[in-house]
Amino acid sequence: MSITKDQILEAFAAMSVMEVVELIEAMEEKFGVSAAAAVVAGGAADAGAAAEEQTEFNVILTAHGDNKVAVIKAIRGATGLGLKEAKAMSEAAPVAVKEGVSKEEAEALKKELVEAGATVEIK
């Protein structure tokens, strides 16, 4: 008996963030791929236009730094995740802490995480 796409989606929906992260890592290892998005090189004029139009930003944690506890607390405060999930997120760097947020919210979160000792990018 084969599993349908709907059954797979239901299984994903029932998983915690930590379980999804572990599943993605296992899939990357098994299939020899990376879940990182491919970067497409475009013309400089196109990049400038796209940057001007961007209204939603992603806050990416690239490293948790030396003060891991403070970074985990900052992640919990920003995302509402539990301790276990926030710890897993900090250890899975690079990882998106928040996606699709305004520039102001992204800058505020970046400042909070950097003050906690993390290395952060906004994309």
Swiss-Prot record:
Belongs to the bacterial ribosomal protein bL12 family. InterPro entries: Ribosomal_bL12, Ribosomal_bL12_C, Ribosomal_bL12_C/ClpS-like, Ribosomal_bL12_oligo, Ribosomal_bL12_oligo_N_sf. It comes from Shewanella sp. (strain MR-4). The keyword Ribosomal protein applies. The lineage of its organism: Bacteria, Pseudomonadati, Pseudomonadota, Gammaproteobacteria, Alteromonadales. Forms part of the ribosomal stalk which helps the ribosome interact with GTP-bound translation factors. Is thus essential for accurate translation. Keywords: Ribonucleoprotein, Ribosomal protein. GO terms for molecular function: mRNA binding; structural constituent of ribosome. GO terms for biological process: translation. One of its GO terms (cellular component) is cytosolic large ribosomal subunit. It comes from the Bacteria. Homodimer. Part of the ribosomal stalk of the 50S ribosomal subunit. Forms a multimeric L10(L12)X complex, where L10 forms an elongated spine to which 2 to 4 L12 dimers bind in a sequential fashion. Binds GTP-bound translation factors. This is Large ribosomal subunit protein bL12.
